[in-house]
Curated annotation (Swiss-Prot):
Species name: Orangutan hepatitis B virus (isolate Somad)
Annotated stretches, region: Terminal protein domain (TP): 1-177
Site for Priming of reverse-transcription by covalently linking the first nucleotide of the (-)DNA, residues: 63
Keywords (A to Z) from UniProt: DNA replication, DNA-binding, DNA-directed DNA polymerase, Endonuclease, Host-virus interaction, Hydrolase, Inhibition of host innate immune response by virus, Inhibition of host RLR pathway by virus, Magnesium, Metal-binding, Multifunctional enzyme, Nuclease, Nucleotidyltransferase, RNA-directed DNA polymerase, Transferase, Viral immunoevasion
InterPro entries per UniProt: DNA/RNA_pol_sf (IPR043502), DNApol_viral_C (IPR001462), DNApol_viral_N (IPR000201), HBV_DPOL (IPR037531), Rev_trsase/Diguanyl_cyclase (IPR043128), RT_dom (IPR000477), Viral_Replic_Matur_Polypro (IPR051320)
Regulation: Activated by host HSP70 and HSP40 in vitro to be able to bind the epsilon loop of the pgRNA. Because deletion of the RNase H region renders the protein partly chaperone-independent, the chaperones may be needed indirectly to relieve occlusion of the RNA-binding site by this domain. Inhibited by several reverse-transcriptase inhibitors: Lamivudine, Adefovir and Entecavir.
Pfam families from the UniProt entry: DNA_pol_viral_C, DNA_pol_viral_N, RVT_1
EC number annotated for this UniProt entry: 2.7.7.7, 2.7.7.49, 3.1.26.4
Residue segments, region Spacer: 178-335
Protein name per UniProt: Protein P
Record's miscellaneous remark: Hepadnaviral virions contain probably just one P protein molecule per particle.
Disordered: annotated segments: 198-264
Domain Reverse transcriptase: residue ranges: 346-589
């Protein structure tokens, strides 16, 4: 007779009528019983010939490509002028005094961030914008180009001007000013003595000694382009490369040093005029010497493709006869002035040799599942996560559920801050630009790649007879609709462009690490500045807690002003006030403990409604199901061990079939969720120990012992002893000398025992006691007459490695009757 859900729960000792634990529990460790139950629940059947189910409700396989939906009316989000202040350490020290070593180290990591992989693959610019939406290729191209242009205007991207120069918008950092054309003048060295930094050939005019400010950075740059003789920065821009800021021979280096920062900023303003006139002119620096500045030819971006006969593909249509009603010349003739072929930034800097290639592709998706009106740029730098160009990213601690509960479970009032475009706050060194390139090859190449006529363009590119090969009804209609949106920018976006990241991009594994370091250091500073409050962050999610709503509001004002003074942009509209139940990282955290948020509970209910019975489900779909159920597993009776059959099928890449009993068992598990409570400090009075043949307990002054029917593996025996100690004493702090029991991971034990032990030991805290000092060691070996003295073992709850580098205030047990506004610092609390 198949096992019913009720009998199964009884077997797992989840119901009250179970017999004595010392008899019932060891049976669950029996291998034969585990096999029989698995067969009864259909958990270990071999693969069957029934076709697999590849979709359960909204869940499809992790690797199945769900077609993204393109929205032709996507709005490109606006980005504020984000400029994180360079003297962030000084500003923090003004607030709290000297920073700790940990805080300083974290803040130095991101000023500027550095990314120098050993090897980088370069792809043709055709692959810059991914053809994710074949039906809307042209529309997607212009939307993506507009997004990139918006990021460039906001100072998030560099624009490659030549192989060795790039322009950008926004305020320059000091390391960029050192690399700025014109900021540091060249000077002749008549004796041909080279600065220490340069290894290249001796030439009369030389750059400043250290181009990057730090010698170590030159090593990075030199290594990133091995195989080419000489240092990159030591090469001099000849006149053919358009040198900026060249000073006449004979003038000493010291003349222009004082005015270097002012002259480079002044020059950036003057440069706009230079671009508009497209001519060479002279200006006088504050040292009185004439400084020569060369403008760019109009098609500097487009002219990189050798052999192009005509300056601009777009404007050629103006001089040609229309080939049909769908000819692009009709669109080009709509406007007299289409604007420049290329735009230049406010500042120009020298960069390492950067090819006209991309290292990752981009495409657009909905901003989030709840907002499909705005787009989000997805950058695919996956080359740095796989293959020969793989980079091993630094690891960082993510708070586990118990640590998070210990830290945040309290009766504080909470609010969460929203940092807008958090990743784009952290600046990247210009030397990282050649590794993080995005862009496009221009509209004609993109259209040619999408169309089947691309082979024609290879042979006769740029000639008049194939100009009209591009004309088609689809392209004409798309461009006419886009003309209403973008106007004369259609011309600008139709040209090729290569851009490199100036701020950290989201598609690189280094970025979450850097963001976590940055926000944790800031929260550490805030906690020390306001010791009567609690600040905590995970990535860009920052929460503030205070004893009362009034305190919280004044704290919010002070912290917001502090963050704004550092140049951090907050979204005041998205600030959420949670009251006493904090919503954070998918959890609801209150004084009673932690539970999953309601939308996750609803998803789980929906999942069980859609879950088919007696049908093999693809293991990739099982991954999705386990991902959802695993998030809420700590809140159920049996926890993760209940999901072990699913984990095993995923590990073996086999289909999984839910039997009615196993599905009903899981559903009852997730029907009632129990909060994970905050651990309390205390003294350990109960100890457990075991040998393969017997167990022993020390319950205060009392000693107990027992034997197993058959010898058991030592870890299993230790787990059983801990369960007996909990059920006999009811103590929630138990001392043990077994590391597996201490870890509270019961997934490697026999399945039935793991499920039962998880429920028995729920809410129990363990303290490590060495075997030699364990009072339960003698009883476990059958020696009841020997009494070792009970240890005074204190248990202190841990907050894990959650980047709490400053002293974190503990949480008051209750709200004070009256809040003293005079000086909240007098009631500062100490850490738990």
């Amino acid at each position: 007779m198949p096992l019913s859900c009720q009998h199964f729960r009884k077997l797992l000792l989840l119901d009250e009528e179970a017999g004595p634990l010392e008899e019932e529990l060891p049976r669950l460790a029996d291998e034969g019983l585990n096999h029989r139950v698995a067969e009864d629940l259909n958990l270990q059947l071999p693969n069957v010939s029934i076709p697999w189910t590849h979709k359960v409700g909204n869940f499809t396989g992790l690797y199945s490509s769900t077609a993204p939906v393109f929205n032709p009316n996507w709005q490109t989000p606006s980005f504020p002028d984000i400029h994180l202040h360079q003297d962030i350490i000084n500003k923090c020290e003004q607030l709290v005094g000297p920073l700790t070593v940990n805080e300083k180290r974290r803040l130095k990591l991101i000023m500027p961030a550095r990314f120098y992989p050993n090897s980088t693959k370069y792809f043709p610019p055709d692959k810059g914008i991914k053809p994710y939406y074949p039906e809307h290729g042209v529309n997607h191209y212009f939307q993506a180009r507009h997004y990139l242009h918006t990021l460039w205007k906001a100072g998030v991207l560099y624009k490659r001007e030549t192989t060795r120069s790039a322009s950008f918008c926004g305020s320059p950092y000091s390391w960029e000013q050192e690399l700025q054309h014109g900021a540091e003048p060249f000077c002749h060295q008549p004796f041909g003595i080279l600065p220490r930094a340069s290894i290249g050939p001796a030439v009369p005019s030389q750059h400043k000694q250290s181009r990057l400010g730090l010698q170590s950075q030159q090593g990075h740059l030199a290594r990133s382009h091995q195989g080419r003789s000489g240092s990159i920065w030591a090469r001099v821009h000849s006149t053919s490369r358009r040198s900026f800021g060249v000073e006449p021979a004979g003038s000493g280096r010291n003349h222009n040093t004082a005015s270097s920062s002012s002259s480079c900023l002044h020059q950036s303003a003057v440069r706009k005029a230079a671009y508009s006139h497209l001519s060479t002119f002279e200006r006088h620096s504050s040292s009185g010497h004439a400084v020569e500045l060369h403008g760019f030819p109009p098609s500097s971006a487009g002219s990189q493709s050798k052999g192009s006969v005509f300056p601009c593909w777009w404007l050629q249509f103006r001089d040609s006869e229309p080939c049909s009603d769908n000819c692009l010349s009709h669109i080009v003739n709509l406007l007299e002035d289409w604007g420049p072929c290329t735009e230049h930034g406010e500042h120009l800097i020298r960069i390492p040799r950067t090819p006209a290639r991309v290292t990752g592709g981009v495409f657009l998706v909905d901003k989030n599942p709840h907002n499909s009106s705005e787009s989000r740029l997805v950058v695919d730098f996956s080359q740095f996560s796989r293959g020969s160009t793989r980079v091993s990213w630094p690891k960082f601690a993510v708070p586990n559920l118990q640590s998070l509960t210990n830290l945040l479970s309290s009766n504080l009032s909470w609010l969460s801050l929203d940092v807008s475009a958090a990743f784009y706050h952290l600046p990247l060194h210009p030397a990282a630009m050649p590794h993080l390139l995005v862009g496009s090859s221009g509209l004609p190449r993109y259209v040619a790649r999408l169309s089947s006529t691309s082979r024609n363009h290879h042979h006769q590119r740029g000639t008049m007879q194939n100009l009209h090969d591009f004309c088609s009804r689809n392209l004409f209609v798309s461009l006419m609709l886009l003309y209403k949106t973008f106007g004369r920018k259609l011309h600008l976006y139709s040209h090729p462009t290569i851009m490199g990241f100036r701020k950290i991009p989201m598609g690189v594994g280094l970025s979450p690490f850097l963001l976590a370091q940055f926000t944790s250091a800031l929260c550490s500073v805030v906690r020390r500045a306001f010791p009567h409050c609690l600040a905590f962050s995970y990535m860009d999610d920052m929460v503030l807690g205070a004893k009362s709503v009034q305190h919280l509001e004044s704290l919010y004002t002070a912290v917001t002003n502090f963050l704004l003074s550092l140049g951090i942009h907050l979204n005041p509209g998205k600030t959420k006030r949670w009251g006493y139940s904090l919503h954070f990282m998918g959890y609801v955290i209150g004084s009673w403990g932690t539970l999953p948020q309601d939308h996750i509970v609803q998803k789980i209910k929906q999942c069980f409604r859609k879950l088919p019975v007696n049908r093999p489900i693809d293991w990739k779909v099982c991954q999705r199901i386990v991902g959802l159920l695993g998030f809420a597993a700590p809140f159920t009776q049996c926890g993760y061990p209940a999901l072990m059959p699913l984990y095993n099928c995923i590990h073996n890449r086999q289909a999984f079939t839910f039997s009615p009993t196993y599905k009903a068992f899981l559903r009852t598990q997730y029907l009632t969720l129990y909060p994970v409570a905050r651990q309390r400090p205390g003294l350990c009075q109960v100890f457990a120990d075991a040998t393969p043949t017997g167990w022993g307990l020390a319950l205060g002054p009392q000693r107990m012992r027992g034997t197993f029917v058959a010898p058991l593996p030592i870890h299993t025996a230790e787990l059983l002893a801990a369960c007996f100690a909990r059920s006999r004493s009811g103590a929630n702090i138990i001392g043990t000398d077994n590391s597996v029991v201490l870890s509270r991971k019961y997934t490697s034990f026999p399945w039935l025992l793991g499920c039962a032990a998880n429920w028995i030991l729920r809410g129990t805290s363990f303290v490590y006691v060495p075997s030699a000092l364990n009072p339960a060691d003698d009883p476990s070996r059958g020696r009841l007459g020997l009494y070792r003295p009970l240890l005074r073992l204190p248990f202190r709850p841990t907050t894990g490695r959650t980047s709490l580098y400053a002293v974190s205030p503990s949480v008051p047990s209750h709200l004070p009757v009256r809040v003293h506004f005079a000086s909240p610092l007098h009631v500062a609390w100490r850490p738990p």
